[in-house]
């Protein structure tokens, strides 16, 4: 019988007013990929932070190689052979590949870096991962996928036996994902212990040997024979309902045309786009990488310059030269890159909610109306069901789903008519996705015109009244909800001929 190499035994972690983990117990084995799944807020990140030495457990034991260990800091975890490859990669773009790989462990003699040994050591690990990259290349010249490979090389150079991946494919292209999986398979064959955190079911089934599910900081179950379970089994384990139940689509009466785009193009939008969205309608935009969906939303929102065409709102032609113009007309955007463009990471939940409407409620122009801000932030927090101990909490401490709900709450402080959602559920767990879908339908019931861009085909079919399909900055077709199938929509996303209707 195989002996576990890594074991969590009744591990708990508490923060003031919050029990993040309660009695988590499971085992991981050498030469296996052990997936960790659960909704945002289930406790996955907290568990990784205990494993990496960022947090001390409040209770429970952690055993590695049969030895009970307590990591008081990240250095102790590294010395024990633990490496975490976080979603936010720990790299210095201005430094070279070699300098990043050996950061903190630069070979030196009499205080002078031994460059020859630095290059030789780096090349050894680049060769191991079959990376055709020069050790002298600055990281800023490489792709995110290559950055991730450097992080893996760094882990191997430090003798890591346990390697945990936190949402590793969220920013990778298809070829980069294939490369990552190839490397993970090699590490498994070498007897490494791999922990793999992801929301992507197809990845989990493809790469994992075992799956442990957490919910609300508690252990639910471990699946050891993946041939006997389905997507629905996993979803039920995580959220207590079937996969098909998460959309909750309901038909509604739509009004007159609210948003009309005619022959629109922009500096980064190399096409000629015309579309309409009615009050109370959800229009889905689907297309493969490079289709131009995000570029279209940014031109409508004024984030990218409009070159030609017109935008009408309720029959009135608008002049939108900036996001400020769009917001003042009632058009708002929740951007694709939530962390870079959607939130202010150094600000609280309340400040992020109020950041747009603040100008309407301040005394004069520069004096903040604290009473209104606190009341509004709390109101939107409750309306959006943002899970946070307090509106004073830094927004970066929230899960992706709760960050997205806070961004939606920001716009509900405005008098909005058109809501543009770019990949609204990217990096969000199944339970939080269902809440976002409910919010979309609730806003549609209030007669907002809504455009949803999504790369998730079941999602775009599940939430939309109509689906407009794009390819290479052209509209290739429009499909009514009643006629929408994955095959039909995907075919339109891959054809070259233009075949459009409003």
UniProtKB/Swiss-Prot annotation:
Its EC number is 7.5.2.12. GO terms for cellular component: plasma membrane. The keyword ATP-binding applies. It is found in: Cell inner membrane. One of its GO terms (molecular function) is ATP hydrolysis activity. It is a peripheral membrane protein. ATP binds at residues 38-45. Its main location: membrane. Residues 6-241, 252-497 form the ABC transporter domain. CDD domains: ABC_Carb_Monos_I, ABC_Carb_Monos_II. The keyword RNA-binding does not apply. SUPFAM superfamilies: P-loop containing nucleoside triphosphate hydrolases (SSF52540). The complex is composed of two ATP-binding proteins (AraG), two transmembrane proteins (AraH) and a solute-binding protein (AraF). NCBIfam families: PRK11288.1 (NF008442). Part of the ABC transporter complex AraFGH involved in arabinose import. Responsible for energy coupling to the transport system. Belongs to the ABC transporter superfamily. Arabinose importer (TC 3.A.1.2.2) family. This is Arabinose import ATP-binding protein AraG. It comes from Mannheimia succiniciproducens (strain KCTC 0769BP / MBEL55E).
């Amino acid at each position: 019988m195989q002996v576990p190499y890594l074991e969590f035994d009744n591990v708990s972690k508490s923060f003031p007013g919050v029990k993040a983990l309660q009695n988590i117990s499971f085992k991981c084995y050498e030469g296996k990929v052990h997936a960790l799944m659960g909704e945002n807020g289930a406790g996955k990140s907290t568990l990784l932070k205990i494993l990496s030495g960022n947090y001390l457990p409040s209770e429970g034991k952690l055993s590695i190689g049969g030895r009970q260990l307590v990591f008081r800091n990240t250095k102790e975890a590294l010395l024990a052979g633990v490496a975490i490859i976080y979603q936010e990669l720990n790299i210095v773009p201005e430094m070279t590949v070699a300098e990043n790989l050996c950061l903190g462990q630069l070979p030196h003699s009499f205080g002078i870096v031994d460059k020859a040994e630095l290059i030789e050591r780096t090349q050894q690990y680049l060769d191991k991962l079959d990376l055709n990259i020069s050790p002298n290349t600055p990281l800023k010249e490489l792709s995110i996928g290559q950055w991730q490979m450097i992080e893996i090389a760094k882990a191997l150079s430090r003798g890591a036996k346990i390697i945990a991946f936190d949402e590793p494919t969220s920013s990778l292209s298809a070829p980069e994902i294939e490369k990552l999986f190839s490397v993970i398979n090699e590490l498994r064959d070498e007897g490494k212990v791999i922990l793999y955190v992801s929301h992507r079911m197809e990845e989990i089934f493809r790469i994992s040997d075992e799956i442990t599910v957490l919910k609300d900081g508690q252990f639910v179950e471990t699946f050891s024979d993946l041939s006997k379970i389905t997507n629905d089994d996993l979803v039920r384990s995580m959220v207590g309902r079937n996969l098909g139940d998460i959309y909750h689509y309901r038909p509604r009466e739509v009004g007159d045309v609210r948003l009309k785009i005619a022959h629109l193009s922009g500096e980064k939008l190399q096409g000629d786009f015309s579309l309409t969205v009615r009050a109370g309608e959800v229009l889905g935009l689907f297309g493969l990488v490079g289709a131009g969906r995000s570029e279209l939303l940014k031109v409508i929102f004024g984030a990218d310059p409009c070159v030609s065409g017109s935008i009408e709102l309720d029959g009135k032609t608008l002049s939108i030269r900036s996001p400020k113009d769009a917001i003042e007309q009632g058009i708002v955007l929740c951007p694709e890159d939530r962390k870079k463009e959607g939130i202010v990471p150094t600000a609280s939940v309340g400040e992020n909610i109020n950041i747009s409407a603040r100008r309407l409620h301040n005394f004069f122009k520069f004096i903040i109306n604290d009473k209104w801000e606190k009341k509004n932030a709390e109101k939107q927090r409750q309306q959006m069901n943002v899970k946070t101990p307090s509106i004073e909490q830094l927004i970066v401490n929230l899960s992706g789903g709760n960050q997205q709900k806070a961004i939606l709450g920001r716009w509900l402080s405005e008098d909005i008519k058109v809501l543009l959602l770019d990949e609204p559920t990217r990096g969000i767990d199944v339970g939080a996705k269902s809440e976002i879908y409910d919010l979309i339908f609730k806003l549609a019931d209030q007669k907002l015109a809504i455009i949803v861009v999504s790369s998730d085909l079941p999602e775009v079919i599940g939430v939309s009244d109509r689906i407009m399909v794009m390819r290479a900055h052209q509209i290739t077709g429009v499909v009514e909800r009643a006629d929408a199938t994955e095959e039909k929509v995907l075919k339109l996303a891959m054809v070259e001929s233009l075949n459009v209707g409003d």
